[in-house]
Amino acid sequence: MASSIKTVILFLLPLLLAYSVLAAPDITDGGDKPGPEIDDGGGDKPVPGNNDGASDYAKPAFEPEFMGAWVIDNPNAGVAAMQLQLMPNDQIVWFDTTSLGASGYKLPEGTPCPINPDANNQPDCYAHGIAYDWKTSKYRPLTLQGDAWCSSGNLWPNGNLMATGGTFSGDKAIRVIANDDPKGDFTTKIGALADTRWYSSNQVLPDGSSVVLGGRDSYSYEIVPPQMEFKPKRFDLPFMQQTTEPPLGPGRPVENNLYPFLFLLPDGNIFLFANNRAITFEPATGKTVKEFPVLPGGSRNYPPSGSAALFPLKLTADNAPVIPEIVICGGNQPNAYELVDARHVTEKQFLPALQDCNRIQPMAADAAWIPEQNMPSPRTMGDLIHLANGDMLMLNGAKKGTSGWEDATEANLTPVLYTPYKPMGQRFKELTPTTIARMYHSCSALLPDTRVLVAGSNMHQFYTFDTEFPTELRVEKFSPPYLDPALETERTQIDPANTDAVLKYGKPFKITAALMEKQPLVLGEVKVTLLYPPFTTHGFSQNQRMIVPAITSVQNGVITAVAPPSGQIAPPGYYIMFVSHLGIPGAGIWVHID
């Protein structure tokens, strides 16, 4: 009899739980108070193979109580991080404008001062870029030729960094720094690009070349191969002029569509979002494949500067179709910049930033914007980055205003953990705040040790320190919740000597790993993630991409997984590979995919 009762209870329990979820009020503010009913933001039933985080493990993942922690990694790195790229040699390259005077890093005595063509051809004895060793916190100066102010960039398949565009003499430049030379500097080719690229965005393609798209008064894109010498070719892109505000032609100072959001889709097309509209297009021809509904609520690109990310691409061993999903958060009203910019007004009015997020599956036949749960607070100029275990982190930015010199106020000091696979009302979790404002011209990057490095912030035309939001030269590191000291024994350790460092498309690869106390890992409790390190600037992490390969076996401390099937899923190049145990990742290692 007892056995029969137990069977009935086990049968009814899932139904009761399902009813309780359906009967619960929708929550839209990230807190505990019910909000008005809205669309369920992708729903509580994620699409299989997409962002179904609940299916990552065969048992519940750990829920750390740790709220994160901040440390100062370096009290003065000398150069504000306007643009930032983590390289496979474990140096982080960041750089600033060269045309607006001194940085905080004067070149050592005896070092030749290069002539700066964008500063009246005078000798410039200050560094405007550095290579920062995240393991030692030491850094060295880099030389920039042609102003890289508000430029874009990406890694080549060999790990070299290519930075594209900027302004003045650098508006068509490419700058390359080699990955295999730990003491290397930029090699620059002025005038290499087909169009001026100031506030443009890059996206790496399946063959390792990259789309360089948009920029001020540049309604076009071009494809740049991973080499210094090439013949530039320009593709007209009327969509970029159509999304400019006001749409009256060159020389307008509002735009609202600079630093457009670009994502390579699994079908090889590019998803392009600018201002409040989106299309997909064929990069080889420029042909528009699909137009999407207008995203209501405001403008999402520079200068309102929202954030966007592609959810992790989850693969199966049998190469089932991958369903990509994109989220866009924050920004501001279309007129927000005009109300704060000195070229328009004498008294600034800082509008509250947007607090909403919206999701879309662009390859779906009926693709439409679905409201996500609101963020806990408004945010403009924030970063939205992948964490090692597949969760996401929002940080940096402001609660009011836009990008631009002195055009924002109320720094948003509180990072937010974003877990899009959880039920509505549980997807955002506010973490330990920093004490350092990271607003305009700040950046962040996930490190191989699973922490997040944060640098930069300069709200001013020149380096300015005696003000409410001073130019920020301190470097911080943030430990996310998964670095809970109480869960140290649940962390994984990869054995690099017995792990495949080169992954071939569609082929199995092996990882030797164990828990910190050498306990064996178990199938169903392990997840592998592969992160393509992004080029981050102005709230958008260009080329950011996380792949979750299928695991086929875990035996005797060896994980066997299947590499991504093609460059359309994972463009060739270097990735950081992490292994997580029930949501708790260990330090990653660099691997190469081709």
Swiss-Prot record:
In the Enzyme Commission scheme, what number(s) does this protein have?
Answer: 1.2.3.1
Report a single Gene Ontology molecular function. aldehyde oxidase activity
* Region (Disordered) location: 28-56
Q: Which domain of life is it from?
A: Eukaryota
Q: How is it modified after translation?
A: The N-terminus is blocked.
A single Gene Ontology CC annotation of this entry is: cytoplasm
Locate the coiled-coil region(s) and give their ranges: none
Record's keyword terms, sorted: Allergen, Cytoplasm, Glycoprotein, Oxidoreductase, Signal
Q: Which CDD domains match?
A: E_set_GO_C
What does UniProt note about where in the body, tissue by tissue, this protein is expressed? Expressed in pollen (at protein level).
Q: Pfam family example for this protein?
A: GO-like_E_set
Which reaction is the catalytic activity of this chain? Answer: an aldehyde + O2 + H2O = a carboxylate + H2O2 + H(+)
Signal sequence, start to end: 1-23
Record localization = Cytoplasm
> What role is this protein assigned?
Catalyzes the oxidation of aldehydes to the corresponding carboxylate by coupling the reaction to the reduction of dioxygen to hydrogen peroxide. Substrates include glyoxal and other aldehydes. Does not have enzymatic activity on D-galactose.
Name by which UniProt lists this protein: Putative aldehyde oxidase Art an 7
